[in-house]
Amino acid sequence: MFQYSAEFKQAKVLVLGDVMLDRYWFGATNRISPEAPVPVVRVQDNEERAGGAANVAMNIAALNVPVKLLGLTGRDETGLALESLLAKSRIECDFVQLHTHPTITKLRILSRHQQLLRLDFEEDFQNVTSDALLQKLDSALQNYGALVLSDYGKGTLNQVQKMIQLARQANIPVLIDPKGTDFERYRGATLLTPNMSEFEAVVGKCDSEEEIIEKGLKLIEQIDLSALLVTRSEKGMTLLRPNQPAFHLATEAKEVFDVTGAGDTVISVLATGLADGRSFEEACYLANVAAGIVVGKLGTSTVSTVELENAIHGRSNTGFGIMSEAELKRVVAQAKARGEKIVMTNGCFDILHPGHVSYLENARKLGDRLIVAVNSDDSVKRLKGETRPINDLQSRMAVLAGLSSVDWLVAFHEDTPQRLIAEVLPDLLVKGGDYKPEDIAGSQEVWASGGDVKVLNFENGCSTSNVISKIQQLKD
């Protein structure tokens, strides 16, 4: 019987692989350079994210599970930046720093939601033989319940056979999301997780379920695997093991917005489940549910234990949704006890538009949980005039509750949410527009409690007033 729980009390996971730092520069583009026929981007914001094996570790940490990350980096600023980023998510890093190579970094320049350019700073590690990395792996294995080898083809796993042997000697399951068509190099692993196209590139075209099973079992025998999980997009996933019936799970995705990083989520939850003592079937079930959540988000994302628990039990993936102040304080206390970072913002959100959506997505990325405090109808009327709000409080909150970026919604009836913020005390208070941080309601209370305050830019040209004006023009 499956343990329908997203709590992994015994799990500890070790990750080794190609670690990367993803950097994003965002800016406005209004003219062409006089020097060359290229756009000029005025950089206004930037963001850093963990990539490659580091993203796998981030996925595991999001499940409130202890995780250690091993890999190769340069002795450079980007390597330090990556370690700092991971430390914020309570990920223990033990990197081998090389003076001969830079930390793999990908810099993307974006404007108006379009990627204009990507710059790669890397020299792969294919010719690097790192005994130090093997020694770190050997000494760490005994303290963990599963090993993930994250292969992005950059060379960190060029001694993958020795790594697999070390794990087998320690009786630790080894899970690998394979790269390329040479699956022989993964001989002896516990589990591979190829997607359908990767699987068919190795075994040939499969025209039926029976052929998938037949060729999958043959591959397991050929390279001495314990199991094979083929992820099949909208067709779900299929687990194959010797002398066991095929175990198929239909997709859990309701809507698919972006499959970026879904493979990392699958192998992260699989490894966590196995490290927690779950069966292959249980771990695959949880991984399938997690994949259904993450493909409904934009960009590389992680899945929290609350989201996973909610999906298992048929609740909304937006967390606990609309709630009273008392309920909010209770769940915030629980989230803080789990070490989650709480972000809070507020507004009228009268007619939801792309500027709102973009702003809330950016706010959510700054922490683990996003609270949106919404002005009551009377509060909006006092601030905006007798003709507002256009939509009543219930309607405004119902629409906001449908956004994947929003975890918790609460109403407030005063002109500002200062009292509410002082009682909730988020880790980060966010406001959009041209405010000075010290002028934002609740900022002093948040600072006094050790939190921070941040101002985010709104998307140019997007406002409720502009929407209302356009509607009035059409009417006239």
Curated annotation (Swiss-Prot):
Q: Which reactions appear under catalytic activity for this entry? A: D-glycero-beta-D-manno-heptose 7-phosphate + ATP = D-glycero-beta-D-manno-heptose 1,7-bisphosphate + ADP + H(+); D-glycero-beta-D-manno-heptose 1-phosphate + ATP + H(+) = ADP-D-glycero-beta-D-manno-heptose + diphosphate
State if Ribonucleoprotein is listed as a keyword.
no
* Keyword Nucleotide-binding carried by entry: yes
What function does this protein fulfil?
Answer: Catalyzes the ADP transfer from ATP to D-glycero-beta-D-manno-heptose 1-phosphate, yielding ADP-D-glycero-beta-D-manno-heptose.
Region (Cytidylyltransferase) spans which residues? 344-476
Region labeled Ribokinase — which residues?
1-318
Instruction: State the pathway, as annotated in the record.
Output: Nucleotide-sugar biosynthesis; ADP-L-glycero-beta-D-manno-heptose biosynthesis; ADP-L-glycero-beta-D-manno-heptose from D-glycero-beta-D-manno-heptose 7-phosphate: step 1/4; Nucleotide-sugar biosynthesis; ADP-L-glycero-beta-D-manno-heptose biosynthesis; ADP-L-glycero-beta-D-manno-heptose from D-glycero-beta-D-manno-heptose 7-phosphate: step 3/4; Bacterial outer membrane biogenesis; LPS core biosynthesis
Q: From the Swiss-Prot or TrEMBL record, what is one GO molecular function term? A: heptose 7-phosphate kinase activity
GO CC terms in record: cytosol
SUPFAM superfamilies noted in UniProt: Nucleotidylyl transferase (SSF52374), Ribokinase-like (SSF53613)
Task: Enumerate the InterPro entries for this protein.
Answer: Bifunc_HldE (IPR023030), Cyt_trans-like (IPR004821), PfkB_dom (IPR011611), RfaE_dom_I (IPR011913), RfaE_dom_II (IPR011914), Ribokinase-like (IPR029056), Rossmann-like_a/b/a_fold (IPR014729)
Taxonomic classification: Bacteria, Pseudomonadati, Pseudomonadota, Gammaproteobacteria, Pasteurellales
Q: Which species?
A: Pasteurella multocida (strain Pm70)
Family matches, as CDD domains? RfaE_like
Name of the protein in question? Bifunctional protein HldE
Cite the EC number.
Answer: 2.7.1.167, 2.7.7.70
Which BP terms in the Gene Ontology apply to this protein? ADP-L-glycero-beta-D-manno-heptose biosynthetic process; lipopolysaccharide core region biosynthetic process
Q: Which UniProt keywords apply?
A: ATP-binding, Carbohydrate metabolism, Kinase, Lipopolysaccharide biosynthesis, Multifunctional enzyme, Nucleotide-binding, Nucleotidyltransferase, Transferase
Family as reported in the entry's similarity comment:
In the N-terminal section; belongs to the carbohydrate kinase PfkB family. In the C-terminal section; belongs to the cytidylyltransferase family.
NCBIfam families linked to this entry: cyt_tran_rel (TIGR00125), PRK11316.1 (NF008454), rfaE_dom_I (TIGR02198), rfaE_dom_II (TIGR02199)
